[in-house]
Amino acid sequence: MKLRSLSFLATAVAAAAILTSAVRTQFSLPVVHAHHGCSNATLIGNYAFSFSGFSNENNTFVPFDGAGIANFDGAGNVSATFAYSSGGTSSTGNPYTATYSVDSNCAVSLTATPGSGGDNFAGAIVRDGDEILTTDISAPDTLTLNFKRQ
C-alpha cells in the first residue's frame, strides 16, 4: 500500500511538472527592456534621406521631391547635399545645413541655418536612431523628410 501511494504521488508530481512546463511555454510573455531615451548623441554618422511633398511657387503648390546624404555630428549639427525635382525642373548638389535638438522621448527638431533658405522639420527618432521621421513645419510647404542610417 505504501509503495502504491508513493508511486501515485510520484506520478502526480511528474504530471504537474509537465503541465506547468507546457503552460509556462505556451503563455510566456516577451522580455521588454526599458528604453534609455534619446539625446543629440543618438544621431551620429551618415544617413540617406528622401523627401516628398509640395512647395509653394508663385502661389501655386507644385510637387517637390528629392534625396540626398546627411551627416549628423552627434552634437546638434547636420550638413547635407541633395538633389531635387520641383515643378518640372531639377537640381543636384544642393547644400543644407541645420542644427538639431533631440528630446529624451526621442522627439527631434531640425532648424535650418539662418539665411540658407532651408526648411525646418519636427519628428521622431525610431529604432535607436536608425531612422528619423519628420514633417516640414515651415509654412507654406508641406513635406515629409525621412532619414535612414547608412
What are these regions (language model features)?
Residues K2-A12:
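Bacterial N-terminal signal peptides that target proteins for export
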Residues A10-R24:
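Bacterial N-terminal signal peptides
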Residues V23-Q150:
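Mature soluble binding/inhibitory domains
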